[in-house]
């Protein structure tokens, strides 16, 4: 069953629109690839001035399922330029661009891994703004032994993680309420 693109974007990416997270990801199902391409183009035009980008990271025309990535360019650039994140991605097999703030080649590599590898690339967590220690903890523990589970599995201070998850969940609740009452996404998206 196809769901409304905009509603799914709010449900999964409200904290990105509110500038609380650098990026979010959602699965969107549609049999109309051309319509999806138009929507992505349109949202890039409408949200670009707020520092937001929308792109399809993975798509399957057979199943009509797509992974749509919504991100704040400046925040993503900052996250992926951190030396410890670059070292982690290098250890995970990514070829690092010469310029530490050039994130585009890293997104292309992530997209390739999503499309072509049998194993899910759990390093995607850093591309979504999860703390590096949570991403590493998830990989090293195969998703077990976490201290707290909310928007993702946390491996650090459970109280801090719960507070952060509560903030993200509250944002999503408020944004959904505003969106359903008629506030357009363009007004919900804050400038970076």
Describe the function of each predicted region:
Residues 31-34, 47-48:
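Conserved catalytic core of nucleotide polymerization and phosphodiester-bond processing enzymes
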Residues 93, 115, 136, 148-163:
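Non-catalytic, substrate/partner-engaging modules appended to enzymatic cores
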Residues 39-101:
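A glycine-rich, hydrophobic loop/mini-helix early in the fold
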Residues 93-122:
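Internal catalytic-core helix/loop-beta-alpha segment
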Residues 1-32:
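Short, extreme N-terminal leader segments that mark the start of a protein/domain
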Residues 151-192:
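Long, compositionally biased
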Residues 12-19, 55-60, 112-116:
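Short, flexible, solvent-exposed loop/turn segments with mixed acidic/basic and small polar residues
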Residues 120-147:
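Hydrophobic/aromatic-rich, well-ordered segments within soluble, folded domains that form packed cores
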